[in-house]
Curated annotation (Swiss-Prot):
Listed name of the protein: Probable protein S-acyltransferase 1
Family statement drawn from the similarity comment of this UniProt entry: Belongs to the DHHC palmitoyltransferase family.
Primary localisation category: membrane
Top-rank lineage group of the source organism: Eukaryota
Keyword check for Kinase: no
EC code: 2.3.1.225
UniProt function note: Palmitoyl acyltransferase.
Keywords: Acyltransferase, Endosome, Lipoprotein, Membrane, Palmitate, Transferase, Transmembrane, Transmembrane helix
Reactions that this protein is recorded to catalyse: L-cysteinyl-[protein] + hexadecanoyl-CoA = S-hexadecanoyl-L-cysteinyl-[protein] + CoA
Membrane topology: Multi-pass membrane protein
Organism, scientific name: Arabidopsis thaliana (Mouse-ear cress)
Catalytic residue list: C172 (s-palmitoyl cysteine intermediate)
Length: 338
């Protein structure tokens, strides 16, 4: 390695947002990544207690039944933690910031806007919003003062991470990360596995106790651990399961949490809806796009040399030239402010 590279820093070391980076910038976490410890304990604690109890019962009663139950619990727990890690440790779709506003982003003066902002250059005034065509619908995109760009459709600036993020759904404190374009499928799988694990532990805790002959209260007192685990999972499944059902509804209608609360697409025409099967195919079977930023790259030597990202190119990369078209001025379609 040259002495010049030794003096330079990588992008993750100078990134101005609040993310936490590990393994030399290979793992990207949110600023509240420490909350993962609580989530891990809430899932792992009951799962480990249940597994230990099943292992104990293998040598005491119904060994075949409890052996299969133990294997199922271990598999579900492993899957839940795998998807949790994949959700929390990857770039969710962070959009590169502009050091300056490129000419491609300066809209025509005919663009209608009631509010104008001054870029960091101080010499260029930009409208606060401009129109973008998405699948025949006009969508308003906002200018982000922090990132110095017009956000792509469905993008949002997360105040917790201080990044503009592609197809932003929400910032989840339980995983300590934004849920967005590049980790949403893993998040849904994590919720699904957690829900199944809750149901699994609840059902087999009670089935295991019911296999013991005698008064229910006597059996419960004799195996209090399984009783407590069953009650814990019964309460938990209403929260985790409800969230899982809600996100499957969002997938069916091709909405994000942010859009559902802000724009109520269930009462309006949704420009992104493609039908239930196509919506699921787009989420779970389409290739996850590569990150727009390689945080392990060397940071530019001269701050003025590099414009880290241009919204015109990002729109094409994120949505494809057939789906998105820049437009100046108003359209007759209903404009949705983004």
């Amino acid at each position: 390695m040259s002495s010049q590279n030794l003096e330079r820093q990588r992008i993750y070391q100078v990134w101005p947002a609040k993310n936490k980076f590990y393994c030399g910038g290979r793992l990207v976490f949110g600023p509240d990544a420490s909350s993962l410890l609580l989530t891990t304990c809430m899932i792992g604690g009951p799962a480990i207690a249940f597994s230990i109890r099943m292992a104990y019962l293998i040598s005491h009663r119904h060994p075949f039944f409890h052996s299969l139950t133990l294997i199922g619990a271990i598999l579900l727990t492993f899957m839940a933690f795998t998807f949790l890690f994949l959700t929390s440790s990857r770039d969710p779709g962070i959009i590169p910031r502009n050091k300056q506003v490129s000419e491609a982003e300066i809209p025509d003066v005919t663009t209608q806007s009631t509010e104008w902002v001054t870029s960091k250059l101080g010499s260029v005034k930009l409208p606060r919003t401009k129109d973008v065509m998405v699948n025949g619908f006009t969508v308003k995109v906002k200018f982000c003062d922090t990132c110095q760009l017009y956000r792509p459709p469905r993008a949002f600036h997360c105040s917790i991470c201080n990044n503009c993020v592609q197809r932003f759904d929400h910032h989840c404190p339980w995983v300590g990360q934004c849920i967005a374009l590049r980790n949403y499928p893993f998040f849904v799988c994590f919720l699904s596995c957690s829900t199944l694990l809750c149901i699994y532990v609840f059902v087999f805790s009670w089935v295991s106790m019911l296999k013991v002959h005698g008064e229910f209260y006597v059996v419960l007192a004799d195996d209090l651990i399984l009783g407590v685990l069953g009650l814990y999972c019964f309460v938990s499944v209403w929260f985790v399961g409800g969230l899982t059902v809600f996100h499957f509804y969002l997938i069916c209608t091709n909405q994000t949490t942010c859009e559902n609360f802000r724009y109520h697409y269930d009462k309006k025409e949704n420009p992104y809806r493609k039908g239930i099967l196509e919506n699921f195919k787009e989420l779970f079977f389409a290739k996850i796009p590569p990150p727009l930023i390689n945080f392990r790259d060397w940071s530019p030597e001269e701050e003025d040399d590099v414009e880290v990202g241009s919204i015109a190119s990002e729109l094409v990369r994120a949505f494809g030239p057939k789906d998105t078209k820049m437009s100046s001025g108003k359209s007759d379609s209903e404009a949705r402010e983004r």
